[in-house]
C-alpha cells in the first residue's frame, strides 16, 4: 500500500494522467476489496474503467468510465467513431438491474 501511495504522490506532483483498468476490482474470494487508485486521486488524474461483464453477465461487454467531464467528452467521441454504441438491450437491462437491486450486495454474493 505504501508503494501505491508513493505512486499517487508522483503522478500528482508531475500531473501525469493514469488509466486504471479495473475489471476485477470488485471481485474477492475473501477480505475487503483493495482501494482503487481513483479513490486516492485528489487531482482527477486517474481515469477509472470498470465493466459489468465480470460482475453481472460475461456476454454484455458493457462498461463504465469515471473521469472529469472534459475527458469523458473525448472518450465518447472515440467510442462513437469506433463502434457507435453498445447493445441498447444490454444497457437497458443493466440500468433496470441497478434501479431495482443493490449492485453492491449482488457483487458480494
Write out the residue ranges for each language-model feature.
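Active-site pre-lysine segment of PLP-dependent enzymes
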Residues: 1-15, 24-55, 68-69
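Glycine-centered flexible beta-alpha turn that most often forms the glycine-rich phosphate-binding loop
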Residues: 21
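Conserved core segment of the aminotransferase class I/II
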Residues: 42-108
Amino acid at each position: 500500500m505504501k508503494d501505491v501511495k508513493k505512486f499517487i504522490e508522483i503522478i500528482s506532483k508531475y500531473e501525469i494522467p493514469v488509466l486504471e483498468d479495473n475489471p476485477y476490482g470488485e471481485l474477492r474470494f475473501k477480505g475487503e476489496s483493495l482501494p482503487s487508485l481513483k479513490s486516492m486521486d485528489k487531482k482527477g488524474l486517474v481515469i477509472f474503467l470498470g465493466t459489468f461483464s465480470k460482475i453481472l453477465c460475461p456476454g454484455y461487454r458493457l462498461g463504465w468510465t469515471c473521469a472529469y467531464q472534459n475527458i469523458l467528452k473525448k472518450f465518447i467521441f472515440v467510442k462513437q467513431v469506433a463502434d457507435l454504441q453498445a447493445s441498447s438491450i444490454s444497457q437497458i437491462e443493466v440500468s433496470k438491474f441497478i434501479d431495482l437491486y443493490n449492485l453492491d450486495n449482488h457483487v458480494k454474493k
